[in-house]
């Protein structure tokens, strides 16, 4: 059951999985969205806010700022222990603070203005705009972050893209220049006045080329061969997301096994 790497580019990871059931590959995809914990703002306490945004809108924006979470997975308690925590919450929360006032000119507040107690948990990017303050306007707040799962809220999902595609097989049977023009993914090219396949893996099986070049091009998917693509928001490296998603599946299978054995 080979797994091959076809792209590792910063926040993006693409793998080819061969001879795996679609259900298994799709389970990894879903787990990467729903069951890999990352840090995000859970609660916001406003001390002062006379900005153009209501407290609720500003809190929502802060919650969607992704935070680096690699170290958090090692040093903070899991979501199961902290989601409903009211007392004895040590190891659950990190705090960030925002205390900014515009003077005589409008001032844009960015994610880099958030000051974190834990220097290992900071915004993925400091250039995320939060709110534009007018002259003499001020925001002062404290926000609490905890680990959470994407199944709770999308702010806790570590991925912006997690998809499974069928592995394409593209065959040129004739010469049809129109295929180069109509293919949205640039799969084809003309070389020496002949139609050739330039980038087979980019094919999304839309069959747009077949509308104009039926008989000249063959498009099909390879059985039990899939492309898994994961794109991180930056909280975790895509490799870590894949590992944690696989661990979550193993835990769920182990839990299912235990319950089945207990019911015998």
UniProtKB/Swiss-Prot annotation:
Quick one: where is this thing mainly located?
A: cytoplasm
Q: Which GO terms describe its molecular function?
A: 3 iron, 4 sulfur cluster binding; DNA binding; DNA-directed RNA polymerase activity; metal ion binding; protein dimerization activity
Q: SMART domains from the entry? A: RPOLD
Q: Does the keyword Zinc apply?
A: yes
Sorted alphabetically, the Gene Ontology cellular component annotations on this record are: cytoplasm; DNA-directed RNA polymerase complex
| Cell compartments where the protein resides | Cytoplasm
Q: What top-level branch of life does the organism fall under?
A: Archaea
What range does the record give for the signal peptide? none
EC number assigned by the record: 2.7.7.6
Top EC group: transferase
Q: What does this protein do?
A: DNA-dependent RNA polymerase (RNAP) catalyzes the transcription of DNA into RNA using the four ribonucleoside triphosphates as substrates.
The record's subunit annotation is: Part of the 13-subunit RNA polymerase.
What's the name of the protein?
DNA-directed RNA polymerase subunit Rpo3
- State the organism named in the record: Sulfolobus acidocaldarius (strain ATCC 33909 / DSM 639 / JCM 8929 / NBRC 15157 / NCIMB 11770)
The gene name reads rpo3
